[in-house]
């Protein structure tokens, strides 16, 4: 049974594409007899003809990728785009380092490992970028007899 006319009319009435028209398989004879717009409208009202929902974009793949990233996957060298300084700016690295150094210096001063003048000297050196880590700073202080 050819239902192209009915599908075309229904698509026009429902303002959807022809491929989104669904016809009840149990009422095909009834639908085939409807050859006017009014007949098709009546069938739509009765529920013999309906518009299928839009397909949309599946979120399965994006969810799967997000799950993998949560587990720490997809972080290999092939996934890295941008320079080293773009992924973690130099300023951020500097801030992390200097905060650690200053915190360590305060602890050393409060625990009386160093005196105020030594604290100030090491503080200024840290600010100038003389130490790249806490261990370097402690080694420097030990080697130059700055510790009490």
Curated annotation (Swiss-Prot):
A biological process from GO = translation
Q: GO cellular component annotations, sorted alphabetically?
A: cytosolic large ribosomal subunit
Instruction: Name the residue ranges with Basic residues bias.
Output: 52-76
| Alphabetical UniProt keywords | Ribonucleoprotein, Ribosomal protein, RNA-binding, rRNA-binding
Cite the PROSITE patterns for this sequence: RIBOSOMAL_L19E
* Superkingdom per UniProt: Archaea
Please give the Gene Ontology molecular function terms for this protein.
large ribosomal subunit rRNA binding; structural constituent of ribosome
Region (Disordered) residue ranges read 52-95
Quaternary assembly: Part of the 50S ribosomal subunit.
Entry function: Binds to the 23S rRNA.
Which family, according to the similarity comment? Answer: Belongs to the eukaryotic ribosomal protein eL19 family.
Q: What is this protein called?
A: Large ribosomal subunit protein eL19
Source organism (scientific name): Methanothermobacter thermautotrophicus (strain ATCC 29096 / DSM 1053 / JCM 10044 / NBRC 100330 / Delta H)
Q: What is the lineage of its organism?
A: Archaea, Methanobacteriati, Methanobacteriota, Methanomada group, Methanobacteria
Gene designation: rpl19e
């Amino acid at each position: 049974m050819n239902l192209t006319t009915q599908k075309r009319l229904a698509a026009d009435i429902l303002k959807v594409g022809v491929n989104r028209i669904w016809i009840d398989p149990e009422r095909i004879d009834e639908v085939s007899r409807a050859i006017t717009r009014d007949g098709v409208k009546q069938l739509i009202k009765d529920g013999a003809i309906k518009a299928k929902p839009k397909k949309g974009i599946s979120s399965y793949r994006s969810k799967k990728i997000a799950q993998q990233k949560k587990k720490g996957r997809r972080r290999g060298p092939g996934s890295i785009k941008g320079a080293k300084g773009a992924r973690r700016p130099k300023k951020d690295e500097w801030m992390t380092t200097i905060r650690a150094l200053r915190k360590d210096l305060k602890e050393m001063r409060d625990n009386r490992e160093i005196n105020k003048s030594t604290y100030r000297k090491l503080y200024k050196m840290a600010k100038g970028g003389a130490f790249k880590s806490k261990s370097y700073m402690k080694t420097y202080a030990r080697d130059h007899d700055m510790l009490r």
